[in-house]
Amino acid sequence: RHVDTPRQLDRMVARVAAVRAAVGDDVDVAVDLHRRFSPAMAAIFVRELEPLRPLFAEEPCHPDNNEPLLALARQTTVPIATGERHLTRWGFRPLVEQEMCAVLQPDIRHCGGLLEMKRIAAMAEVHQMALAPHNAAGPLGVAASVHVAATVPNFLICEGGACLGEGLFRTPLRLANGFIDLPTTPGLGVDMDDEAIEAARDATFNLRAMFWHEDDGSFADC
């Protein structure tokens, strides 16, 4: 649901503070706000986050609402991240040229692929913005994103889910101490397990879990 009351805001700040207290100052903490704040509430929230020094605050308000995003970026010391819903370098151009954020998050599935992500990263580099590829679709997106990340100087961090190819790749990606070993074999460096993929065709996924609802069950997705 949307965060639209001080009570909700205080509860979320407390959660971030609890995470910071648990992991200490040597672990980076990024906060994904998932467009759930109005510009006014987002301004209050990121100000409350400043003492906790998050790596970035992702999509505090709607990513297509450019003017409030720009105003927010200019009034806080918390780096603002956005871009997972933007398409091609032309879609990222206003974000970069007007410096609406500190971190760009192109998704390789729909930003235009490997070369387009590199172009977006180059645009960002000129404005001293970081690249943090978004990925919420599976290990193949991670494999493609880390190849781009390894070739750009302004790479910050790469998003990935719990699966790094287990049960889908013959040799899953390897994560150790927060780093993924870059595959060295041709292409994306992963070999799909066709039999495992065929066996997974009948798997189900609860799309309802991706939407927000108010306490009374009414639809609340933005």
Tell where the protein language model's regions lie, with residue ranges:
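C-terminal extensions of enzymes
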Residues: 168-222
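Shared catalytic-loop signature of beta/alpha-barrel
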Residues: 47, 53, 64-187, 191
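Metal-dependent enolase-superfamily TIM-barrel catalytic cores that perform enediolate-based chemistry
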Residues: 1-76
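Acidic-enriched, low-complexity/disordered segments with a strong bias for Aspartate over Glutamate
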Residues: 4, 10, 25-28, 32, ...
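Structural signal for hydrophobic packing residues in well-ordered secondary-structure cores
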Residues: 20-23, 53, 149-153, 201-204
